[in-house]
């Protein structure tokens, strides 16, 4: 399928945006995942270097990841991911007062999680490349209703300085085309600044698209300011 990302989102493909490596345990905390969620069809968008897909599939589940960076060649992508792990670790250590390090086993534990997640994702990519699809919001190369849940980590709201209200709404509407439920985390920007006006405006616009939204608490977040996630569902969606 031809990927047709909107030009606005091409700005998010540059080197300023981290290709982040996170584990399934971190996703479980951020998105409040439970056993029923993990039995469904999951899309991680953008997947980055997260090992969630690899771990879900290794346990017998069904998950895929979508990210514009997957269009890179294998060695180019590996280099970008490993460089961004170094950059992410350095950034967080430089702002260590903004994080609850005990949640990730201290500075050393946090770095180990990042490197392990990246290694696991890259190993899975080599073994099962069909799980990692090159694509970008707001035009994903996936069929409507091809998943039960879309997870969106550290893109929307995180880069609010580069994405406006319409960008956020268009992205969420597209993810809601793929699955009846979308979970987005965090609701602060990359510096931890709250975005109440943007969040309210997004929710209001989504309602006009017949998408219901609610804000849920996140238990023991690693980033201290990132205490909530946004859950978006089609208004006709019946939760199990």
Predicted regions and their residues:
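Class I S-adenosyl-L-methionine-dependent methyltransferase module
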Residues: 58, 62-130
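Conserved beta-strand signature within the Rossmann-like core of class I S-adenosyl-L-methionine
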Residues: 171, 175-188
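Conserved SAM-binding strand-loop segment of SAM-dependent methyltransferases
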Residues: 128-140
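A short acidic, Gly/Pro-enriched loop at the edge of an enzyme's catalytic core
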Residues: 138-151
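Class I S-adenosyl-L-methionine
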Residues: 190-240
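A short, conserved alpha-helix within the catalytic core of class I
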Residues: 159-174
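Class I SAM-dependent methyltransferase Rossmann-like catalytic core
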Residues: 2-40, 51, 55-59, 71-82
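A conserved beta-strand element that flanks and buttresses the S-adenosyl-L-methionine
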Residues: 151-152, 183
């Amino acid at each position: 399928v031809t990927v047709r990302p909107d030009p606005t989102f091409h700005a998010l493909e540059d080197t300023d945006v981290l290709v982040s490596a996170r584990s399934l345990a971190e996703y479980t905390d951020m998105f409040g995942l439970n056993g029923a969620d993990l039995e469904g069809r999951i899309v991680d968008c953008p997947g980055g270097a997260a090992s969630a897909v690899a771990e879900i599939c290794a346990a017998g589940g069904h998950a895929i990841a979508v990210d514009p960076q997957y269009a890179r060649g294998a060695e180019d992508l590996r280099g970008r991911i490993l460089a961004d792990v170094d950059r992410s670790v350095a950034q967080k250590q430089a702002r260590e007062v903004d994080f609850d390090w005990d949640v990730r086993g201290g500075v050393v534990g946090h770095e180990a999680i990042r490197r392990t997640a990246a290694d696991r994702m890259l190993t899975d990519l080599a073994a099962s490349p069909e799980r990692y699809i090159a694509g970008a919001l707001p035009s994903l190369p996936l069929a409507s209703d091809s998943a039960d849940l879309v997870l969106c980590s550290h893109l929307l709201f995180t880069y609010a300085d580069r994405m406006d209200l319409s960008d956020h709404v268009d992205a969420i509407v597209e993810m809601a085309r793929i699955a009846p439920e979308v979970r987005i985390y965090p609701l602060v920007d990359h510096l931890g600044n709250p975005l109440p006006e943007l969040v309210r405006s997004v929710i209001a616009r989504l309602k006009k698209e017949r998408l219901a939204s609610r804000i849920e608490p996140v238990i023991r977040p690693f980033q201290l300011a990132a205490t909530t996630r946004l859950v978006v569902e089609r208004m006709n969606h019946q939760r199990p």
